[in-house]
Amino acid sequence: MNAVYIEITNVCNLNCSFCPCGKRNSSVPPDSQASTIPPQNSAPKEPREFMSSELFELCIAEAATVAENVYFHVLGEPTLHPGFGHFLKKLEATPLKLNLTTNGTTIARVSERLLECPAVRQVNFSTHAYAELPREPALTYLQDILDFCKMANAVRPDLYINLRLWNVGDDSSDAWNRTMLAKVGEAFGSNIELGHFCSRHKSFNVTGRIYLHQDSRFEWPSASSTTERLPVTSSPTERSDGGDPSITSTNYSVWIPSGQSPSRMTAAGTCRALDTHVAILHDGRVVACCLDHSGQITLGKITDQSLAEILDSPTATNLREGFKKHELRHPFCQSCSFCKRFGK
């Protein structure tokens, strides 16, 4: 397995329309920068939390047994965690490498810590988020990112940096995308245009190990309105609906269509979840993929079992076998558009 996604917080300081964080009100710590984007709707507030240091240390210890890399997000902006610098230090004591994905709004505050940490392998900046910001703060944040890139080139030339524009094809973002590319060109002498993007050519070298990564926008998967959560069973063979017993684990139920066996309700497709990666939410729940922010395919809890045991659970095995056979056996997977990228 390549990576474990560890959601150190589900707090974010932006309310992007394309992200589940932006579809409900969120709280941010007092010292964080407030969002300049108003909430997109009036959905009820859901808990926003920060992973404890004890849980984080357990997560990286378990991650080191199955993977080489970690991310610090599922939802949320990881650099907002009050213990972000402390977590970097803890990570240095393991063989794990960090691929950090950030919206970049706080990069000026954490840049020194990142560049001094040998465990940081790659930094991904979601610059497409700025298309929804007023021009002035967007340009300020972008300049902070470009300044970081220049510093990294000087002191950490081994550090990979991706400047992401994952909104290609979204006409409302074109103006920002052109502005962003022009600013990158001014900073590094590159000449990359929007028209250069195609589904098989998404990454463009800017300079050194700095890349522009373009892609289309995707919709986050969600549970089907026809699904319901099974009651927790005492053993994987107890299923009141007569369905495939391997789809539930001993202690955790999953979402399945009402009255249907998951093994009979499949759709064509595959995913890299449980092959290249797995995710741990801020409360310790282990989920099948990096997009399952609400724990709809909860495989277990890292405080109850080892990560290796959870990955070997009946539910994980069932899903993994399905992916190998190009079967999406879970409604959450069937509602996911991200997996369509794998065939491009």
Model region roles, listed by residue range:
Residues 13, 17-20, 272, 334-337:
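Cys/His/Pro-rich metal-binding microdomains
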Residues 1, 48, 263, 272, ...:
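Residue-level marker of regulatory loop/turn positions in helix-turn-helix DNA-binding domains and
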Residues 1-122, 132-143:
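Conserved alpha-helical substructure of the radical SAM core
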Residues 6, 10-13, 265, 327-330:
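Processing junctions and N-termini across compartments
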Residues 1-5, 22, 31-39, 285-344:
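Flexible mid-to-C-terminal extensions adjoining Fe-S/redox cofactors in radical SAM and related proteins
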Residues 24, 68, 96, 276, ...:
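Generic structural signal for secondary-structure transition and capping sites
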Residues 28-33, 94, 117-305, 310:
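Radical SAM enzyme [4Fe-4S]-AdoMet core and its adjacent flexible, acidic
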